[in-house]
């Protein structure tokens, strides 16, 4: 967790953006997790940073990362815990965290495949299309949809070129 000396706050200093090595988050079960505060613009870095938050899960977990203007992680929300082969999510649930997290200028969604194979299903592709369309309407860039598997394997809709190709006019990424 980032510590700001109390006397700094009393002097009226304003803090705009922090650059620190790690950010401490709590997962959906209350466990403390430390994640690097690297920019998550690159799918490889995003996968390496976020995959450990979903590692060793026996069921599909769907989460959203709220990102700053520099694509640094501001907040992490687990939105759904499903079964070994699926999870359900509603579109509004994905965008509510952006409203609750000051400074959010982009989103990155991620879910795991407990089978270990990050290959997207047809349902994953349809969901990504719907998310990208909604993000475009809300003028809130969807940076990527990552699917993480085992052994550091992942699938990035952005890297595959399908995130921007799915919508006429593209999604700003």
Protein language model features and the residues they cover:
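Active-site-proximal loop/helix of nucleotide/amide-processing enzymes and allied scaffolds
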Residues: 1-28, 36, 45-48, 70, ...
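Glycine-enriched loop-and-adjacent helix/strand subsegments that border the catalytic/binding cleft
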Residues: 29-72
